[in-house]
UniProtKB/Swiss-Prot annotation:
GO biological process, alphabetically ordered: symbiont-mediated arrest of host cell cycle during G2/M transition
InterPro entries: Papilloma_E4 (IPR003861)
Annotated stretches, region: Disordered: 21-59
GN (gene name): E4
Organism lineage: Viruses, Monodnaviria, Shotokuvirae, Cossaviricota, Papovaviricetes
Name this protein carries in UniProt: Protein E4
Amino acid sequence: MDCEVPAATRYPLLQLLNNYQTPQRPIPLPPAWAPKKPRHNSENDSDLLSPTPPQSPHCPWTIQTTKYTVEVEALTLEGTKVQLRLRL
């Protein structure tokens, strides 16, 4: 036998509200938020990477790698030094 206790007995402060009615069923929780997965082109990402980058005669560049970083350094024709450090 299922005996339900009135809401006013379980929660006496609800008596302070006028015309309060206990919901028939609990309100469902919103769905968990998750970031959308990025869409990729049909090409495989590994096809886009070159194991050894081509050397440009106009703007030579160097690459240095460590266990957790990749560094690219180039010198433009104007003499500007460009450095890029990617931390993995």
